[in-house]
Amino acid sequence: MKNIVRFLFVSFLFISCQQKIKPEDISKINGYWEIEKVVFDQGEDKEYGINESYDYFQIENNNKGFRKKVMPQLDGTFIVNDTYETATVRFKDDKTFIDYSTPYAKWSEELIAVSDKELVLKNAEKKEYHYKKAESINILGDGKKTK
């Protein structure tokens, strides 16, 4: 009986602490995001150190936009290509999803948390992708501001 009560209490805490995403939070997705770790369904984590690519999101006021991979350069710029995924934010049953599509595939990820510094997405395989807000890299020390 004690174990059941503990389980219910912990479950309640977990559910009540989960962030409720509001429409005004969606603009926080915009920008460059660097993956920090992936949490697998079985509970194991894969930590990421330095990443060769970032995810760049641009979501407009109509909840539509895109995601693309960019590669940061040492001078503060990014290498980009023409490949991208269209992205649409969808609210359903107190959950928030980002629906992606390319000419070849369609899929969704649940938006678990978003803030100015953190983004957490969960895919259909129940893998949680934890991102941190990324900035351009400028180690050349030329003093120039990067965009």
Feature map (PLM): residue ranges:
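Short, solvent-exposed coil/turn segments at beta-strand boundaries
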Residues: I29, F57-G65, F91-K95, I112-L119, ...
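An anionic, turn-rich surface loop/hairpin at beta-sheet edges
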Residues: I79-I112
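N-terminal helix-cap/turn-to-beta initiation motif at the start of protein domains
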Residues: Q19-E34
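Edge beta-strand at a domain terminus
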Residues: K122-K147
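Sec-dependent signal peptide recognition
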Residues: K2-V10
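N-terminal glycine/threonine-rich, aromatic-flanked beta-hairpin/loop signature
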Residues: K46-V89
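C-terminal motif of bacterial Sec signal peptides marking the signal peptidase cleavage site
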Residues: L13-S16
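Short, compact, well-ordered microdomains
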Residues: E109-Y129
